[in-house]
Amino acid sequence: MDMLNQILSINNGGAYGGGKAGGAFDPLTFAMKPQVVIRALCWLFSVVVFGCISSEGWTEKDGKEYCLYNGDGMACKYGNMVGVFGFLASMGFMGGEFLFERMSSVKSRKRYVMADMGFSALWTFMYFVAFLYLWSQWSSSAPPPLGIGAGSMKTAIWFCLFSIVSWALCALMAYKRFLIGAGDEFTSAFETDPANVVHQQAYGYSMDNDNDQYSASPFGQPQQGGMEQQQSGMEYQQPTY
């Protein structure tokens, strides 16, 4: 769990868990990013899957191409399709990680994170289907002549299973990024809400007026001057004889 938490720890202080836009590029730091490491594993697993199936998944039987997965051509085609598109998507998202740190627009980062989360979740499901499909067909198929291609078919099945884990981790990291960005948007929206600013100003103005009223003298200066004149006019004057 500690290793998983370390992998999913992606908050770098910028929008949607990325770094500050315009920062200096460090190749070593970029290569050690959890997103890049997991994408590289997805890329490697995809290469193994479609490489094994395309190289030794087909054989000729009675003048026709025969899929070693119980003769089911769709099984070989589906495994190739999932592997090829996973390979291309992994390279695309690794390039996206390079550009992600340079995206100054929060909306652009949000679109990228949502695309990453959606595609990673979809390809987790696609590899899950591929694992079940290929394993089911292989368990029902007869051993190939001289055992040629059997190792590659088993390897493709195992790496479909590994791909489920790697793509699921990509989806989890993208989901955590999305939560970080959603929390930042909520905080900034609350702080800049005009209604909140108006209420704060109104409360501050009321408090200032109350303090002024309590600190002010009950009688103004002109009234004090009038009282002094009345007192001076009412002073006793000694009569003259």
Curated annotation (Swiss-Prot):
One of its GO terms (cellular component) is synaptic vesicle membrane. The keyword Membrane applies. Keywords: Cytoplasmic vesicle, Endocytosis, Membrane, Synapse, Transmembrane, Transmembrane helix. Pfam families: MARVEL. The keyword Transmembrane applies. The chain crosses the membrane at residues 34-54, 81-101, 115-135, 155-175. It is found in: Cytoplasmic vesicle membrane; Cytoplasmic vesicle, Secretory vesicle membrane; Cytoplasmic vesicle, Secretory vesicle, Synaptic vesicle membrane. Residues 220-241 have a biased composition (Low complexity). It is a multi-pass membrane protein. One of its GO terms (biological process) is endocytosis. Residues 216-241 are annotated as: Disordered. Disruption phenotype: No obvious phenotype. Viable and fertile with normal basic motor functions. However in type 1b boutons at the larval neuromuscular junction of some mutants (30-40%), there is an increase in the number of synaptic vesicles with a large diameter and a decrease in vesicle density under resting conditions. Resolution of synaptic vesicles from endocytic cisternae following an intense stimulation is delayed, and consequently boutons display an increased number of cisternae. Residues 30-179 form the MARVEL domain. Required for the correct formation of synaptic vesicles at nerve terminals and has a role in the regulation of the synaptic vesicle exo-endocytic cycle. Belongs to the synaptogyrin family. This is Synaptogyrin. It comes from Drosophila melanogaster.
